[in-house]
Amino acid sequence: MSKTIATENAPAAIGPYVQGVDLGSMVITSGQIPVDPKTGAVAEDVSAQARQSLENVKAIVEAAGLKVGDIVKTTVFVKDLNDFATVNATYEAFFTEHNATFPARSCVEVARLPKDVKIEIEAIAVRR
């Protein structure tokens, strides 16, 4: 049995999907673009965009009663792999700040993302 996750601390879905799904032992987030849920703003800088996407993922995971340390897999979609080092630095800092081990991860370059943002991140977390 799955349960829809909804929180005001992450942006509302911009299509026919939910922010996340709680499967009981596992939480799966939809891809999070770097929209500030309070203002709707998107930063220009890829580092700030990466941080906001991660904060949005965190909000969904926390809405399900889990924490950053429960994330076991992420997929990172970037518009330009030349931003890889910058994204990595932001990603590393985020997980380090939350005293979390790094999850498994895939990172791919894509042609375009919604709202023409530079990054989108989705995650899987497990209830331990």
From Swiss-Prot:
In this UniProt entry, which residues are annotated as the site Important for catalytic activity at high pH? Answer: 120
Give me the residues that bind substrate, please.
105
Is Hydrolase one of the keywords? yes
Q: How does activity depend on pH?
A: Optimum pH is around 9 due to the greater stability of the enamine/imine intermediate at high pH.
Q: What subcellular locations does the record give?
A: Cytoplasm
Q: Which domain of life is it from?
A: Bacteria
One of the protein's GO biological processes:
response to toxic substance
Assign the protein's first listed, main location to one coarse class. cytoplasm
* InterPro entries in the cross-refs: RidA, RidA_CS, RutC-like_sf, YjgF/YER057c/UK114
Specify the effect of residue 17 to F: Deaminase activity is defective. At pH 8, strongly reduces the increase in rate of 2-ketobutyrate formation over the rate of IlvA alone
SUPFAM superfamilies assigned: YjgF-like
Positions of the record's site feature: Stabilizes the substrate = 17
Key word RNA-binding present:
no
Please give the GO cellular component terms listed in this UniProt entry. cytosol
The record's statement on gene disruption is:
Cells lacking this gene appear to be compromised in their ability to synthesize isoleucine. Mutation results in the partial block of at least one step in isoleucine biosynthesis subsequent to the reaction catalyzed by threonine deaminase (IlvA). Mutation is required for the dependence of the PurF-independent alternative pyrimidine biosynthesis (APB) pathway of thiamine upon the oxidative pentose phosphate pathway.
Q: Which CDD domains match?
A: YjgF_YER057c_UK114_family
Gene3D superfamilies in alphabetical order = RutC-like
Pathway it works in? Amino-acid biosynthesis; L-isoleucine biosynthesis; 2-oxobutanoate from L-threonine
Q: What is the effect of changing residue 120 to A?
A: Deaminase activity is defective. At pH 8, moderately reduces the increase in rate of 2-ketobutyrate formation over the rate of IlvA alone
For this protein, what reaction is catalysed?
Answer: 2-iminobutanoate + H2O = 2-oxobutanoate + NH4(+); 2-iminopropanoate + H2O = pyruvate + NH4(+)
- What is its quaternary makeup? Homotrimer.
Put simply, this protein is called 2-iminobutanoate/2-iminopropanoate deaminase
Source organism per entry reads Salmonella typhimurium (strain LT2 / SGSC1412 / ATCC 700720)
Q: What is the lineage of its organism?
A: Bacteria, Pseudomonadati, Pseudomonadota, Gammaproteobacteria, Enterobacterales
